[in-house]
Amino acid sequence: MRPIIFILCLLPFGFAASGCNGNPLGPATLPNVLDTVVLGALVGTEIGTPSAFAVASGSAVRSDQTSQFDFAYNLESGGRHVFLPQAALGISNSSGLAPGLLLSDESFSGITEAPLNGYSTLDTVTIAVNQVIVARSSLVCTSIGVPVYAKLRILSFDDADRQVTFEVLANRNCGFRDLVPGLPDN
């Protein structure tokens, strides 16, 4: 019985030591990398065209094959370009935290850390060229109950092909919010 008590007494020291690097989960293992993504509109494109984005994988996905995405793109009648968070599409989220989008007045390079709050989860978000957006995933790190984050900047629209092109930097490390290239510290 005494060895168990001894081990239990050492646990707080182990947690304290692991927290010395700035994140109690230990160092990040996945580097933040800048990428360029093209999405086709939900309506009016070929069925095989990816029209949604999953922050956790940092990739475009087909919304007809999975609901494991955070937002989708559409070109509405009248020419308005929009991103739609999952809930705006009527997709319920069982993780307890709905994916969201946050329009930013900061430059793409000026965003170095994802905010914790302020994300639009239910509303359609109108987008424009050079618009900067921070995206929050659903709870993909279920063992610790946190989302992952990304920042993106709209580069261009192709109305004829009903596409949007954007650059994205996703931090796919659980518990980290840094949005700068390389291995994040936080």
Q: What is the role of each PLM region?
A:
Residues 15-19:
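C-terminal motif of bacterial Sec signal peptides marking the signal peptidase cleavage site
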Residues 1-8:
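Bacterial N-terminal signal peptides that target proteins for export
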Residues 20-186:
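Surface-exposed, beta-sheet-biased, low-hydrophobicity segments with strongly acidic/polar composition
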